[in-house]
Amino acid sequence: MDLRVSLRRVLVTCILLVCVSSCSTGMETVLTTLKESQPFYRPASVKPNNSRYQYLRVVLNDKETFLALGYEDPSPKGPIEVWYSSAQQVLKIQNGRLKGITGLNTEWSQVDLSLAPAWDEILSQLAKNAHPLPYRWVRTRDEMPGYKVGIQEQLEVTPMASPSRPDIREVDLQKLIWFEEKKVNDPNQNSLINKIVNWATKEDLPASRYAVMKQGARTVVVYSEQCIKKDICFKWQRWNAPQLKYP
C-alpha cells in the first residue's frame, strides 16, 4: 500500500508540473516560482497568479511559501486534500485538520481523523448555546523518524476569541469563527500499549487553532495553526490567485 501511495504521489506531482509547464506564460510563472522554492520556503514577494489552480499559503519559521493542490481523495468524512511543494513535501488536510505530512525532518505518515467532530455540528451547538460543552475526540497517528506507531491523543475543541493580529491575508476577519484544539488527559486510555506509546513520545504539542467560515451551505476552515513537534509549527491559509484573462 505504501509503495502504491508513493508511486501515485510521484505520478501526480509529475503530471502537475508537466501541465503547468505546457500551458500559458502565467502557468510558467507558477512553475518557476515552485521550482525556486526551498522546502516550505520561497520569497514572500513572489505569489501565485494563476486562478486555474488552488493554492495554500504556508508560513513555517516566519518564511512564506505556496503549495499547489494536486488532487483530492474522496472519503466519507470529507475529501482529503493533497498539497505539494516544489521539493515534493506533501501536506494532507481533511476538514482543516492535518491528515498527514511528509518531506520534513518530522513526518506524520498516517493520521486517523475518523472520530473528529464535524465543524457544522460544532457551529450548530454554538448557535444554540454560547458556552457549549467542549467536544472531545481521539486522534491516532504514526510519526517518523523512530517509527512511533499508534500515538493516541485525546483532543478538546473549544471556541476562542479572535487573535489580536492573526497572520491572515485578504480575508474578512469579521466572518471568521475561531476554535482551539488541544490535548487533554484521558483517564480511559490506560492500556499498557497506550502507556508505552505515549511515554515514548514524551511530548504534548501546542494547541491548534482553526478559523472557520461559512461559504454558502459549506463550512470551511480557511486558516489554521498546527504543530507536528514542539519546535515545528506552521500556519496555513487557503489562497485565491487573482482572476486573470486568458485567450
Protein language model annotation of sequence segments:
Residues D2-V12:
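Bacterial N-terminal signal peptides that target proteins for export
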Residues C19-S22:
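C-terminal motif of bacterial Sec signal peptides marking the signal peptidase cleavage site
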Residues S24-S85, Q89-T102, T106-Q110, Y135-P247:
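Acidic, serine/threonine-rich low-complexity disordered tracts
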Residues P117-R141:
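Surface-exposed helix/loop patches within compact recognition domains
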